[in-house]
Amino acid sequence: MVAIVEVKAREILDSRGNPTVEVDLKTEQGCFRAAVPSGASTGIYEALELRDGDKTRYNGKGVLKAVENVNKVLAPALVGKDCREQAALDRLMVEELDGSKNEWGWSKSVLGANAILAVSMALCRAGAAAKGIPLYKYVAQLAGHEAPEFVLPVPCFNVLNGGKHAGNSLAMQEFMVAPVGARSFGEALRMGAEVYQALQRLLKAKFGLAATNVGDEGGFAPDIKDPREALGLLVEAIRAAGHEGKVKIMADVAASEFYSKEAKSYDLDFKSPAADAHRLLTGDQLKDLFKEWSEEFPIVSIEDPFDQDDFSSYAALTAEIGSKVQVVGDDLLVTNPARIRKALQHKACNALLLKVNQIGSITEAIEACKLAQASGWGVMVSHRSGETEDSFIADLVVGLRTGQIKTGAPCRSERLCKYNQLLRIEEQLQGRCTYAGENFRNPSN
């Protein structure tokens, strides 16, 4: 037994200057720290992120209540327990100490997913240390991969920002480049950085220096409105960097952010102050637009193409382009096994975006991943737009063998710490791993 001797939480700041929860969990082997991220475009079905609501402090976004819940509720219950009991202790926190539920499962609405997850992540680090193995190997064991061949993921770099992540006119949230033709993760990182730098030069020449300002995730945020123009810029940057054919395009539409439930339509110009009914698109019209783009551009993945409840549009798109394009559910699924099962029934998508803070514990995140993988889906591990310097998801993606990760542009330290940790893992494995490459949708085959 390796007993937990202390658990302490504090309020720190994330990459947007908003408060978040950090936890130190101590055993006889040392102190293990974790910090949780937060999103800007959040799905309505995500587990509850507990905020204080005190408008006189951090505009109501303080997390002192969540910190108190760790220190006064979770800590006393965990001290003395074996840190290697990840699943049992996650269940204790989620089902007994919090206990709140909704139609989709455990909602964490009493203690807060941000409180529980911070402890769960720190606990995972302590468990790995107790077993004397790297975090990614411990995650693999927790997932039931006893002797896995490790897979290094394709990094999906968000190089053009729009939506809620940037102050420009672009409705769609992320335009990414994915070096599927690289031979290793290290080479993929180089390719991504070279495309990013080529794009910077291109934007400066076309639109001026202001166009190279960056958004929340390190991508550029030029004041363009047409998604087709954004896609064309990526094609041009890939060509200029000398990586045509080896670097593909991915998009995160985040369509729930510009969907009107009343009008049952999508507004690709939702940031414009002037309302115009003529620019609204039905789900079917938007589907046809995605299909057109997938034929015109080297697009291999589209995330959240429709509203989080528009299962029929998802299913129609997946049926039409799903064999050659990954259709990813983020707000649709919120890393929730119950939502994944519903999507499977509807044949709504063919990939899961895995965000640990959407579900609120490492055990539940692993369960969601395994369900998706067992169903033949792809799985992409993801950061959030409000990030910290915690690199946990780098080890998570290797341990779960999902083959793809998105954690921003090759810019801003809270993004690069994940990519750099993956470089270290690849170096540590020294040939005892493969790079997912073009098999990113199903790297185990």
Swiss-Prot record:
Query: Which of UniProt's keywords are assigned here?
Result: Cytoplasm, Glycolysis, Lyase, Magnesium, Metal-binding
Presence of the UniProt keyword Cytoplasm in the record: yes
Fetch the Gene3D superfamilies from UniProt: Enolase-like C-terminal domain, Enolase-like, N-terminal domain
Q: In which pathway does it act?
A: Carbohydrate degradation; glycolysis; pyruvate from D-glyceraldehyde 3-phosphate: step 4/5
Q: What is its EC number?
A: 4.2.1.11
Assembly, per entry: Homodimer.
Q: What is this protein called?
A: Enolase
